[in-house]
Amino acid sequence: MDTRRILEHPVLAPVLSVTFNHDNSCFAVGLDHGFRIYESGSCVLRTSRDFGAGIGMVQMLGRTNILGLVGGGRQTKLSRNKLVLWDDKSKKQVGVISASSLVRGAKMSSKRIVLVLMDRVQVYQTAKPHPLLSTYETTDNPLGLCCLSSDRIAFPGRAIGHVQLVEVETGNVSIITAHTSALRAMALSQDGELLATASEMGTIIRVYATSNCARLYELRRGIDKAIIFSIGFSPSGKYLACTSDKSTLHVFDVTRPGGTRPITSNGGTAYAAGEPSVTGNNRPSSPYSVASSSGGGGGVMVNSNNGGSDMAADDGQGRWGFLSKLPLMPRIFSDPYSFASAKFEMADEPVSNGSREPLTRDGGLAIIGGPLKGNLGWISETEMVVIGAGRDPKWEKFAIQEGGQQDGYQGGGRRLVRVGWKRYGGETP
């Protein structure tokens, strides 16, 4: 009888959350004993701090030494109702912002600090003494959804599926009726000119011009319902990518030549200093070109071994070919699909007895700072990383490549290729 012990992957203390800095060049993870910061492009450990207690979320202020910390884990180091400003160079607390309830998320820039609570968003001045500038009520926001660019803040509205878009300097608020079901993910482009949203349905991603709230695109991830983990724009806003619980990374074209008008021109309503005002054509137009609803992606599907609908890609003529041109056909035949897709790893979580427990559909362990798996960040115009948290944390790097051969495909189209993989978290500081 073979009595040799089966080798099992060691169960590590879980990574509680994953967050990127402003340009995705670094990512930070909260741990049961402290936090770590890595270079996104290489997954090389940059900073490690062991407090002997849990940090639920780490938010970076660019590439500076200032971090925002929120307590978490089995034995928390800090209160979950406070954002502690930590100077990692001097290794000491330099400020604290208290909230009336659990902090669900936080964003930081050189001008503003944004705290996300369950039913409101609070905006503070970054400069000391960090005065509270404004408070915005929201619908319940357990995921802590919020986006911050240099001049705009986006977060859920007071009604399900709505988005509030705030101009940092003026305080003007625009309301975008994005979806009929609750928001699941959102992202601003780096220049703040584009906003992408996804709902709990997970089939459609909508893209808006923030200058006039016009809806520019409706991008179809797939036909089946899915949970969108993360969405993000490439640095120039040319591409948009998303991850979902289908364990698939999709990449879409956003700016296509030949577009002449948006799908709709009345995607939102603006309010100046709390008073209703007319927007629409009075607001400046977006510098981005817009697409019709019948566009093709000019690419190919890769990693197509499963044949599932979630791996479908646009071949330049539309996924459905001539059917997309027929009148009165359902929208699924004419919606733009991703031009390339690839699988990322979303394994079950190992537990202490050696068995494995499946991930929950909402992303698992992480309460703040993002989902357990599928945290997406663009690191260049053609490269992105997908980072998982939990007890088996992984880093994966993908690249858009032109032409070549993969999975039986050979030609001049685009494909999405995994070019790096690493299990992180066990490094010696």
UniProtKB/Swiss-Prot annotation:
Protein name: SVP1-like protein 2
Extent of the WD repeats: 10-48, 50-96, 178-218, 223-262
GO biological process terms on file: autophagy of mitochondrion; glycophagy; nucleophagy; pexophagy; protein localization to phagophore assembly site; protein transport
Residue span of region Disordered: 262-297
Disulfide bonds: none
Record carries keyword Membrane: yes
Family to which the UniProt record says this protein belongs: Belongs to the WD repeat PROPPIN family.
Gene3D superfamilies, alphabetized: YVTN repeat-like/Quinoprotein amine dehydrogenase (2.130.10.10)
InterPro entries: PROPPIN, WD40/YVTN_repeat-like_dom_sf, WD40_repeat_dom_sf, WD40_rpt
The record's note on its domains: May contain a beta-propeller domain involved in specific binding to phosphatidylinositol 3,5-bisphosphate (PIP2), leading to the association of the protein to the membrane.
Principal location class: membrane
GO MF term list: phosphatidylinositol-3,5-bisphosphate binding; phosphatidylinositol-3-phosphate binding; protein-macromolecule adaptor activity
Domain of life: Eukaryota
GO cellular component term of the entry, any: cytoplasmic vesicle membrane
Localization of this protein: Vacuole membrane; Cytoplasmic vesicle membrane
Keyword terms: Cytoplasmic vesicle, Membrane, Protein transport, Repeat, Transport, Vacuole, WD repeat
Topology relative to the membrane: Peripheral membrane protein
Organism: Neurospora crassa (strain ATCC 24698 / 74-OR23-1A / CBS 708.71 / DSM 1257 / FGSC 987)
Role of this protein: Involved in mitochondrial or peroxisomal functions and amino acid signaling pathways.
